[in-house]
């Protein structure tokens, strides 16, 4: 099950679906606020808790007991917390580009940025907001590497509901807790987790190293010279890493971190 980021929708998983559907049943969906899914006008209908439950409700509706969950950015945040709340429903978690605004030094700036972007969607529409997002620092490498892919990403973003995007930004992105607030829960997590992040995704690098240290069943893959949308920038590398991870999990060989590997941590 693929869970998309704020700046995209189910269409941005196309290169993953083409690859993984050869061996797996693949499910993509648009989050609430992203047509053709419903776009509630009530702000209370948005937020990270709703997004976590939406994954579970989708699975229940499709009569799926458990699945591999793959999320990017906002979708990765929901996927990670899904693993905390619905442990038995997750075979594994692929958590890509998670954690913008999670570090203490980023909290205030991320909150302000999220609300400013929400205002752009409301006052100037999705086309203007899409221009801002697609030209942000974490998207530049996609533009540099794959101009056609970047233009497609921008076009899809321009098509999003300005109301749904604004409310998602205000109620989910701006108000979600820092991942560091869930430290105790992460330390108890036993689900296999692959953390994936680009080394030029500045707002996510540190928090992914932090998560690696908290989640004893996690592995961390850092993709060089890569920004935020790691699955779009480096689809072949991303698919390969995820394929290897899923294969290892299904063979029962994705094990907890060996305690011996941290004995020198205080040197």
Name each model feature, range by range.
Residues 84-85, 90-124:
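Flexible "cap/lid" loop of the alpha/beta hydrolase fold
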Residues 202-207:
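Conserved alpha/beta-hydrolase "acid-adjacent" motif
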Residues 189, 195-197:
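Short beta-strand/loop motif that positions the catalytic acidic residue
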Residues 218-267:
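Catalytic active-site module of serine/aspartate enzymes centered on a nucleophile-bearing elbow/loop
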Residues 104-109, 123-185:
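Conserved alpha/beta-hydrolase catalytic His-Asp/Glu region
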Residues 49-67:
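Conserved acidic catalytic loop of the alpha/beta-hydrolase fold
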Residues 71-75, 79:
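Gly/Ala-rich beta-loop-alpha elbow adjacent to hydrolase catalytic centers
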Residues 1-44:
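Conserved HGGG/HGGXW glycine-rich cap/lid loop of the alpha/beta-hydrolase fold
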């Amino acid at each position: 099950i693929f869970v998309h980021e704020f700046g995209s929708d189910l269409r941005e998983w196309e290169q993953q679906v083409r690859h993984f559907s050869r061996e797996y049943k693949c499910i993509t969906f648009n989050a609430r606020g992203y047509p053709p899914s419903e776009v509630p006008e009530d702000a209370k209908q948005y937020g990270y808790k709703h997004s976590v439950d939406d994954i579970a409700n989708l699975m229940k509706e499709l009569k799926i007991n458990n699945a591999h969950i793959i999320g990017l950015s906002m979708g990765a945040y929901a996927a990670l917390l899904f693993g905390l709340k619905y442990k038995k429903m997750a075979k594994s978690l692929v958590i890509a580009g998670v954690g913008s605004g999670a570090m203490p030094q980023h909290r205030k700036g991320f909150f302000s940025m999220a609300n400013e972007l929400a205002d752009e969607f409301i006052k100037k529409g999705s086309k203007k907001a899409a221009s801002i997002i697609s030209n942000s620092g974490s998207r530049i490498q996609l533009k540099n590497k794959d101009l056609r892919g970047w233009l497609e990403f921008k076009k899809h973003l321009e098509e999003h509901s300005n109301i749904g995007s604004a409310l998602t930004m205000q109620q989910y992105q701006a108000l979600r807790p820092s991942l560091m607030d869930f430290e105790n829960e992460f330390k108890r997590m036993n689900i296999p987790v692959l953390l994936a992040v680009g080394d030029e995704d500045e707002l996510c690098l540190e928090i992914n190293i932090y998560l690696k240290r908290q989640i004893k069943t996690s592995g961390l893959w850092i993709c060089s010279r890569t920004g935020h949308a790691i699955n779009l920038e480096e689809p072949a590398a991303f698919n390969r890493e995820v394929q290897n991870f899923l294969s290892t999990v299904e063979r029962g060989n994705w094990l907890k971190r060996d305690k011996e590997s941290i004995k020198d941590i205080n040197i």
